[in-house]
């Protein structure tokens, strides 16, 4: 039966349809001036940029010049790239310009769409940032689309890992800057640790277009970017505590897979207290006494390491190191680490060398970083399922852009089997059948373990004609993805999300040319070979189309519908036919967590035999409801975490703004004088209480404070004995004495040196106290949840205590700066420029207590002797010169072999 909502949508169209239609008049206007724009010479077309900028200088708005600007970009794209944006792509560009998210299906040309609003907004001269998920995509898109911007007289920069500050500054100074979300966030944090404004690299946050916006603003929303420095080695403690966990029995702890949490029962707590007491690690009588907070943290991490984290699913052990596997993409993240000691707990569990912990020096979440932009937009193929979150947190609407050609993909109902083995047997039969028919197959799995299990079972069937794409073999993933659309190809992939390379039926032309013709110089031979490849791909594409297009087989449903939709969306690009189907079993994680026991008994009663599947739209709906529950829970977690993070964010803004003011100032004497006055106020208030009798005044305490902080030897006891003296008199005498001592010192130093010393001491002290403050807030955050047991709101308690800590930070700053300046003495050589601390970049995931960590760069920098390289294992090669022979033995240069796709 059709609902009233359905009838209304048929009559009036959905709200999305109405939003899309609202852009149609502009599309018509752009089309109406297309011929006129085509008639312009290259020079006249390029001159339009200066013309538009002049109009903006006269007071016109970006909206006023949208129509001619879009027409100019469309024509420039046609001339430079031989790509003319379709009408729906113009609509996509307008959606991005209007501070919204454009949902565009795979293969609909998101990269080209971005050029329209990027050019328009870059005309303001304030800079536009195009955000991608990895360095490879940033470089690829900047190189390709930079040709269009360059043709129109605009500069394009790209920020990737490994650039110097000078190179970064130059890239940010360009009209358009392509960068990864990580590099942008880390540059912001590093800028706010600099000591001179001219050392900073970013120039503001005007407009950002975020590609794969759901991945960055939802999946990674909970993952703070962290700059940290090393702490003392505590590996012995980790090993000691790790040895306790195997001695526990299941009744000693409770595991909640839904919440990704692990807690000890009363029995378990008693056991641990005895073990800790014997090891000399327990302070006091009870484990949960305040002095044992650090030990509780360690044992909780050890329990999670053993009971929640699974080897080959959450991480792998490679070359004696624990390497994280990205939950969403299935890729290894070498160099990244879980924070808060969780990675060390895993290292202790796996009996590998325990790396030292790090102290947070600065951090920010993507949620708070991207909310700094004056204007924000995003692109993705899957955003509707998270529309509420984008609206609530980022104030971004999600608008679905119609496809240029209708989607012909057939999404079949799920097949649900009782056991894992039955499901895999059915999947293998389906793969072999599709392969015989010449249909390309993409099989999506949720973990490395399952992808390799499927591969092993295929081999047992005597079938070896397949490729495996997961974290262990990611060196070759770009080429594997590019060839996944060849007739009969079978590709097994761990979570295809974020792969960054299109699956084109027949194969990827650019990839094949690069791989096969990289050594051949331009000329007739190269052109002939290219033409032969073009014809071959055309023929292969026709065969794949005849066989039904790309067939996506999913071996399990993910917690998020969006990840499932991303996998499905790999098929049926640009109007091609395709097919998708999910194969499930009652032993799958999602099914098990959401009551598969009841369903199993029901299916047994219904007489479902071994090897039979249940297929019904109701099953799909039930699973989607389960996924919606998980998504809603995850959204609530992210929303709640943001409330806590906003407390730190507000304080961070105050500190960073204060630092910027200090960097921009050449003379902060007035600020220093105010600090000194307030310190004296505090000293007097502390030792001469209001309305107290003179006999109750603390002369000894005040003298000690004056000596320690103001570095003055004053007859305070004698002052206190004077007849009729009041606290105002004491305050005035202290102020005069401190000011006189400081003025005398300033005259000896000279104005320039004194101003430099003041600024250096204030900034270094502020940085030191801010780092301590971050650690204190982390500790507060880790225990504040227990206030809920006392019927108090943990968030309000956190806000209140965080404010007290911040007030304490400001008081300590005034006191420490005053004490240092009253003691500082001039040496013969000028003081050295303060050095930033030893730093590492990390990427934390607080939702599960995990931490994505990011010195991503270490492994590839090691030089390995040729005789120690295994040709079949790229992880043993180390750093290789671009023009060296590829260690795999192909005979090609590294840049034309494995090096061609190492950054994907």
Curated annotation (Swiss-Prot):
Cofactor binding note of this UniProt entry: May bind 1 zinc ion per subunit.
InterPro entries from the UniProt entry: Helicase_ATP-bd (IPR014001), P-loop_NTPase (IPR027417), SEC_C_motif (IPR004027), SecA (IPR000185), SecA_CS (IPR020937), SecA_DEAD (IPR011115), SecA_motor_DEAD (IPR014018), SecA_preprotein_X-link_dom (IPR011130)
Biological process annotations from GO: intracellular protein transmembrane transport; protein import; protein targeting; protein transport by the Sec complex
Coiled coil location: none
Record-listed ATP binding positions: 89, 107-111, 502
GO molecular function: ATP binding; metal ion binding; protein-exporting ATPase activity
Annotated residues for binding of Zn(2+): 886, 888, 897-898
Keyword annotations: ATP-binding, Cell inner membrane, Cell membrane, Cytoplasm, Membrane, Metal-binding, Nucleotide-binding, Protein transport, Translocase, Translocation, Transport, Zinc
Enzyme class, broadest EC rank: translocase
Signal sequence, renumbered to the chain: none
GO CC list: cell envelope Sec protein transport complex; cytosol; plasma membrane
EC annotation from Swiss-Prot or TrEMBL: 7.4.2.8
Cofactor(s) recorded in Swiss-Prot or TrEMBL: Zn(2+)
Keyword Mitochondrion listed: no
Similarity remark: Belongs to the SecA family.
HAMAP family from the UniProt entry: SecA
Quaternary structure (record): Monomer and homodimer. Part of the essential Sec protein translocation apparatus which comprises SecA, SecYEG and auxiliary proteins SecDF-YajC and YidC.
Described function: Part of the Sec protein translocase complex. Interacts with the SecYEG preprotein conducting channel. Has a central role in coupling the hydrolysis of ATP to the transfer of proteins into and across the cell membrane, serving both as a receptor for the preprotein-SecB complex and as an ATP-driven molecular motor driving the stepwise translocation of polypeptide chains across the membrane.
Protein name (record): Protein translocase subunit SecA
Species per Swiss-Prot/TrEMBL record: Rhizobium etli (strain CIAT 652)
Lineage of the species this protein comes from: Bacteria, Pseudomonadati, Pseudomonadota, Alphaproteobacteria, Hyphomicrobiales
Name of the gene: secA
